[in-house]
Amino acid sequence: DVLVPRPDTEMLVEVALELRPQGVLDVGTGCGAIALAVADELPETRVVAIDISMDALRVAQANTDRLGLGDRVDVVSRGVNSLAGAEPDGRPFDLLLANLPYVSEAEWDGLAPEIREYEPREALVAGPTGLEAIEALLAKVAELERRPGAVALEVGAGQADAVVGLVSAAGFGEVEKRRDLS
C-alpha cells in the first residue's frame, strides 16, 4: 500500500546533507524514507513528514518508532493544501523536500508490470500531464507567508525544464537541475 523508495530518491537526501537545514518539510513522505534518512544523518534537524495516505502515514510512523527518531520526526496527516501551520515550533522550514506523483495518466499503462501491479497508483500518477501534484505544491508554497529557503523535488524524465519554469514562477530565484542516478 506504500510506494517502494527508488535509489533516485536519495538525491533529495543528498540535497539536505549539503544544505544542513534546521527544519525540513517532507511532502508526500510515503514510508518516511527521506524524512528518516535526513533525521538520522542530521541530528540537529527537525523534520515534519506529511502525507494524505493513512496507509503511508502508518508505515512512516512505524518506521519512525522502529528507528527511535520520534523526537526529531513528526509524522502528520496533512496535504499540499494545508502547508501553512506545519512548521515545527512555529519556525519556517529551511528546506522543503518532495517526491510527489509525477507520472501522467497516459504513462501509467506503459510502466513495468511489477510497478503497475504492486505499487499504489495514487502514489505515482499525478493526472493528465504528470505535473499536477508539483503544480499544486508550488502554488501553495508561493502563497506561504514564510516560504522555505529551498525546495528540492524529484521529477519524471523529460519534466525538468517545465518544473524549472514552475519553480521560477513560484518566486524562487536560483534554480538548479540535477541528474539522478539512472
Locate predicted features.
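Acidic catalytic motifs of isoprenoid enzymes
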Residues: D1
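Glycine/small-residue-rich loop that forms an oxyanion/phosphate-binding "nest" at active or ligand-binding sites
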Residues: V4
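Conserved SAM/SAH cofactor-binding pocket of Class I
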Residues: D8-G110
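Acidic-residue sensor for enzyme active/binding pockets
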Residues: E10, E41, E114, E119, ...
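Class I S-adenosylmethionine-dependent transferase superfamily signal
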Residues: V38, I115, L137-V141
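Helix-to-beta-strand junctions that scaffold the AdoMet/dcAdoMet cofactor pocket
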Residues: L69, E119, L144-R147
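Mobile active-site "lid"/loop adjacent to the S-adenosyl-L-methionine
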Residues: L100-A133
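Conserved Class I SAM-dependent methyltransferase catalytic core
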Residues: P128-S182
